[in-house]
Regions:
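Function-determining sites in protein domains
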Residues: 1-172
Length: 172
């Protein structure tokens, strides 16, 4: 197991494995249907996850947020993550999963460029036994446009169910 030495590395680990977040109802990796994350260079980092309830078969969406500009960088004990979770209609959760599962993109292409400032995106479906994880940069190849569009549409849908974020810039 890797030792995480900075607050941001701990926060990113929790954003990508949101069942590690202790301040919301306990969830298991095997109940997670999908996890999406957006890591901008100069804005709060966010992840959205869909979970199926173990006893009720009810679905939930969980959003976690972390602002790397806040707090003391070496404080790995408290990485300053904010979370919210609400029920999501089963039909909506099913449609989201089906859309991601039906997506086709060329997977094993070397990127044509690299970036420093921008946004890193990711999606993870599955668990320890079988899974797919995809990461891409804000300057993605044209073949990945459907993935990026589906990501943006899904995040907008999920955010419409969740309370307003207290970390993102709010227009007055």
């Amino acid at each position: 197991m890797q030792t995480l030495l900075s607050r941001e590395s701990v926060a990113l680990e929790i954003l990508r494995k949101p069942e590690l977040f202790p301040s919301l109802p306990k969830r298991r990796e095997f109940d997670r249907l999908i996890c999406l994350w957006r890591i901008p260079s100069f804005e709060p980092h966010s992840s959205w996850s869909l979970y199926r309830g173990r006893e009720t078969n009810e679905n939930f969406v969980r959003r976690l947020e972390h602002d790397p500009r806040r707090g003391f960088p070496s404080n790995v004990v408290d990485p300053h993550i904010f979370g919210s979770e609400v029920p999501i209609p089963t039909e909506m959760a099913t449609k989201i999963i089906e859309q991601f599962e039906g997506l086709t993109v060329p997977m094993f292409r070397s990127p044509a460029w690299a970036g420093v400032d921008g946004v890193s995106f990711g999606a993870h479906i599955g668990n320890f036994w079988q899974s797919t994880t995809v990461n891409w940069w804000s300057s993605f190849s044209p073949e990945w446009k459907p993935l990026n569009e589906l990501f943006q549409e899904t995040v907008a849908q999920l955010d419409s169910l969740l309370p307003t974020s207290t970390l993102r810039k709010i227009e007055l």
